[in-house]
């Protein structure tokens, strides 16, 4: 039998599989109709789409009262580093065992979120990756994404991005004090006057 004769058969199989996928997705939509609000909310998160939202909800549900806090949810899911510390030093950064499927979906979303322009998650990823490497940064972003899911589902609120400049704004006063102190030690008298553009 010639290979050319096999091609139509493969095309038919692919078409059949595509039809089955479409039917399954339609069925998932139907089953998730009562949770449509929650799915739509989570789909607003950078790195998420509706399929990811379905996957997360399938694992954690929509009732966050089952978890005392966002950290409890993250611990249950296995997306927060172990807290083994001695004299203030972390002994282990390994994540705890949790839902492998959920952790996988969150890590995929974390990679996507870390590449979104003007997003808090991009800044957060870069901040952690610079000191602890990309793998730990992805776990940190995954944890942050799940915490966001927790509060959005708990409060039924829309996503609000803190922005790519969040950490700069957070540390603005701290950095100002630091540089004033350094300049003073170097023998300079420092008088601060905000620039009109920064005021």
Pin down the residues of each PLM region.
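A detector of single, family-specific signature residues
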Residues: 1-199
């Amino acid at each position: 039998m010639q290979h050319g004769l096999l091609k139509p058969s493969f095309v038919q199989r692919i078409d059949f599989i595509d039809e089955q996928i479409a039917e399954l997705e339609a069925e998932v939509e139907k089953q998730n109709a009562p949770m449509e609000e929650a799915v739509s909310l989570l789909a607003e998160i950078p790195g998420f789409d509706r399929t990811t939202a379905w996957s997360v909800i399938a694992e954690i549900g929509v009732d966050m009262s089952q978890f005392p806090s966002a950290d409890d949810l993250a611990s249950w899911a296995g997306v927060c580093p172990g807290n083994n510390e001695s004299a203030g030093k972390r002994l282990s950064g390994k994540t705890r065992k949790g839902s492998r499927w959920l952790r996988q979906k969150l890590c995929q979303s974390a990679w996507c979120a870390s590449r979104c322009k003007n997003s808090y998650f991009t800044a957060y990823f870069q901040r952690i990756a610079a000191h602890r490497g990309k793998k730990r940064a992805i776990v940190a972003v995954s944890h942050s994404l799940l915490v966001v899911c927790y509060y959005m589902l708990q409060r039924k609120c829309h996503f609000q991005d803190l922005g790519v400049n969040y950490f700069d704004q957070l540390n603005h006063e701290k950095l100002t004090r630091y540089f004033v102190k350094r300049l003073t030690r170097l023998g300079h008298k420092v008088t601060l006057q905000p620039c009109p553009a920064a005021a």
